[in-house]
Amino acid sequence: MYNRLRSMSFSCSAMDSAGPNISLELLPLELREVYQSWRRSSATPDNYSDDVQECDWPVSIYVPERYEEGYAYPLLTWFHSDANDEDQLEDVMNAVSSQNYVGLALRGNTELGKPGGYRWDPATFAQGSVGLSELMHLTTCRLRRAFHVHSERIFVAGSGHGADAALHLFSRHPDWFAGAILLDPFCEPGTLPAEGPGGLDRKSVLVSLSRTCALDNLGRCVAAVRTLRTAGASVDVRMTELPVDPVSPEARSLDYWMMECIQREQEGGICR
């Protein structure tokens, strides 16, 4: 994999292939043609363009110190807050839960002059010619080949403009995720699809908003929550006195929320 990686106990070679390792001979006859057609399609991560396959977008992976091979871990995909980078992932994972999840983070696509670091630019969720959706799909597929990740327990989360990036991805590809966590999003224009999101029925979303946020920001967030609920999502809005610090002890509540989602999914319900 060409993405630059920083991680714990991780080998880049383990993520060279994105597709599932399936032996054609082991498939039922009626599924072989479907599988072969899928492998040849442009939607297959291994068939993405060279720009995507060889993108040098920096990525960080978090693996629990006591990683258990036989356990299917939930995956937390993190979009960092402003003036940070992908290395914020380790602090976030330690604050949320150091053991319960595998973590994945990409660097924001806009470098900041002062105070330094990066952020996500809502005007274009891309890195050069490489779109965020394609790169995230490819990276997640490769990650699942390297580690035992539960395909139905992938959460997307972010803070600030990172929350906008998370919402952008979640609203366009809800089938990829079990739920979304949006900490103090800006909900800039273009974050949600112009035609309105689809496929959100019974999807769980957690939104935190600070009482100190600007009125125009609050208005955009209220409108976004209404749009998500109209599309069928179950949105839990939590008001806080100050913006949530994703690396502080209060981030532990995100673990509780995700574990509740997983429990309700096992019971056939939704997270509230």
Outline where the language-model segments fall.
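The feature captures the conserved acid-bearing segment of alpha/beta-hydrolase catalytic domains
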Residues: G179, D184-Q263
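A domain-start/cap signature at the N-terminus of enzymes
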Residues: M1-Y73, Y101, A223-V235, Y256, ...
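Serine-hydrolase catalytic machinery in alpha/beta-hydrolase-like enzymes
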Residues: W38, D51, C55-Y67, P74-H148
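Short glycine-/acidic-enriched loop or helix-start segments at secondary-structure transitions
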Residues: D87-L89, P115, A166, T191-L192, ...
